[in-house]
């Protein structure tokens, strides 16, 4: 679980993870939650119905795609230089890739708190055990890491 960035050559995320705007882009000055030094250090492909020009912050270039999971993954792999592609979230994006059967391994950290309403990835992680092996690793903080890998 500590090896989060090893061998990652590109990331795919949904628009909700990128920022709070919905609908057409009203503010092209918004460049994400993370400031001038994004934590990705790879190309990032943001899935959105409203494309906008790509831009670069530090060593991360953000590309905005209105694409299927298959097409987005093809673009990300082409940019990943032989490395893996991480599906970074949010929930709707992860579900799309799971539904398209495009996930090989997955690490989901679950905190023991309820923040109110939101999207659920699952009711129980056991829902995925028809396709994936599952190992649960608890931590002293109460966080449980769910590690999935394809059967």
Model regions and ranges:
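Enzymes that bind and transform nitrogen-containing heteroaromatic metabolites
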Residues: 1-151
């Amino acid at each position: 679980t500590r090896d989060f960035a090893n061998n990652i050559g590109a990331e795919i995320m949904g628009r909700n993870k990128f920022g709070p705007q919905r609908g057409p882009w009203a503010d092209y000055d918004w460049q994400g939650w993370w400031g001038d030094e994004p934590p990705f250090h790879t190309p990032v492909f943001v899935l959105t119905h409203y494309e906008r020009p790509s831009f670069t912050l530090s060593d991360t270039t953000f590309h905005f795609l209105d694409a299927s999971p298959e097409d987005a993954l093809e673009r990300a792999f082409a940019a990943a230089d032989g490395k893996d592609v991480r599906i970074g979230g949010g929930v709707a994006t992860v579900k799309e890739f799971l539904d398209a059967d495009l996930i090989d391994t997955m690490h989901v950290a679950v905190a023991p708190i309820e923040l109110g309403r939101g999207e659920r990835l699952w009711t129980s992680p056991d829902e995925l055990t028809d396709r994936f092996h599952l190992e649960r690793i608890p931590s002293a903080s109460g966080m449980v890491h769910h590690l999935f890998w394809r059967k």
